[in-house]
Structures are given as C-alpha cells and as structure tokens.
C-alpha cells in the first residue's frame, strides 16, 4: 500500500518504480472509436458525447509533439516532475492503421523525459499487430494498456451501448498480459440498472484476471450524451456522494492487494457536466473515501476471495 493509505495508490507506485514523481501528460491524437465511426455503431456509449473525453487539442491543430512540450513545461512547473508518461486518452487509441499508431507513439516517446506510454482503448480494438508493437515498446519502458470494461455484466454493457461483451474483455486482457503488457481495467460505478451487488461482482471479476491495475470512475453525466437525456427526463438518477463513497470502498475491499489503483473518481470538464455537482470537489471525495476505510477498519483486499 502507498504510505499509510488503505489502498495501493498510483503516485506511490510510480515513485517506487522510478525513484521520483512521475506525471501523466494527456494527449489527443485525433482518433475515433468503432462505436462512432459505424463499424460497430454510430451513437457511442450511453455516457459519452462526441468529444469522447478528449481535450480537443488535435482539432485545435496541436501535434503530439506540441502537446508533449506544453505538458512537460506545465507539469514540471506545477509538480517539479522530470519524468512523464505519454497518456493517449481521447477515444480508442489502438484503433487506427498500425503505421499511423507507430508514428504517434514514437512521436510521444521521442522525448527523453518520457518513461512510458499509457493507452486508453477498447477490448475490441486490439489486433495482434498492435499488441506486438506495444510489446516491443514494453521491453525497455513502461506500457499501460487501459482497457474499458465498465461492468462485468453483459446486460449492463448492452444497456449502455458498449458494443462488446464481458468475454471480449477477458480475452483481450489475457492476450495483452501474455505479451508482457500491463493491463489497467477501467470500470464505472453507478451504471443504470446496477446496485451494490452488481458493482461488487465486477470487483470480484477483476480479481480473477491478470491485471496490473484498476481505474474506478464515477458515472457522471455530460451534456450532449444519451445519458443526459435520461437524466433530464428523470429516468436516470446519479449516485449521491454518500452512495458513491460506500460503493467505492466496497469495491476496493474486494480487489486483490497487488492491483494499483489508478483512479478513484472522475475529472469532468466543468463546462460539460450536467450532474452530479458534488464530483467537482475531488479532494473532499478522496478524503471521505479514506475516512470511510478508517471507520470500517478495512483496506484493499480485506474481502478479496481467490
């Protein structure tokens, strides 16, 4: 665990691995998603809008090189960091021809300060040639493959229009891990139709896979998404802050102790957020999570079952 925290936090893990603070630089490569370009669908996932959690940097004409340069300057000034992970976040960052992907990744890794690569993507966007490319990078640097699962329940995945099933994620995570890649599962708590039991079952599912880490995200509502329509009609109600605190602690208690927790809530763009307003106060949410672990006297792995 990191310091005296009740879970294995990312910052402590990175300091242990690299001997100093490491920061992620968020990159927008102007890519798309098979759930938007027509290969699987066109509307995207229920909670996603047309910006796909992106920064819009690519559309503003900023190359990967420019984004890296600006990120290094900004994060070095703010945190005193000298090492960075190139984090391709927007849309599906393994969904393009292999030559294009190699060029994008190489451009980010050309900076001597870049010690690793993190790619947000879908489990159905992992062709063998992409995995082989990433395995090559992983021989001498950190490579995280952040795979979107969201839920371990097929009924939920259908409800949110994911376009893949749980078996697809299982196969993708297993194939990636077999090549030596570090897989981070992205899950969302508060999805429509899910209660405490379903969320806890997703945690148990993660514990059976060859994962490096988990990224836990609150389901918040952004404008121009399908979820926004459901929220405005009253057909979806966000978790309260108290409910979210309980569900996250329940979740982490059921994860194996070795998994690195990459995220514990979300960081919505304030101008896009419809609800819930409480998620904008991230420091308070994180402190309340720690307080709840203290109240229960538990920590990550307390209720993990092999």
Feature roles, as predicted:
Residues 1-85:
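N-terminal [4Fe-4S]-dependent radical SAM core
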Residues 75-77, 105-112, 132-142, 174-178, ...:
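Acidic (Asp/Glu)-rich catalytic clusters
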Residues 51-71, 75-98, 112-126, 142-169, ...:
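Core AdoMet radical
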Residues 167-226, 242-265:
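Conserved C-terminal portion of the radical SAM core fold
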Residues 23-27, 84-86, 117-119, 143-147, ...:
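Hydrophobic faces of well-ordered beta-strands that scaffold small-molecule active sites
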Residues 1-12, 18-23, 213, 221-306:
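Auxiliary Fe-S-binding modules of radical SAM enzymes
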Residues 98-106, 127-136, 199:
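Distinct, well-ordered alpha-helical segments
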Residues 45, 107-114, 201-215, 285-299:
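Structural recognition of alpha->loop->beta junctions
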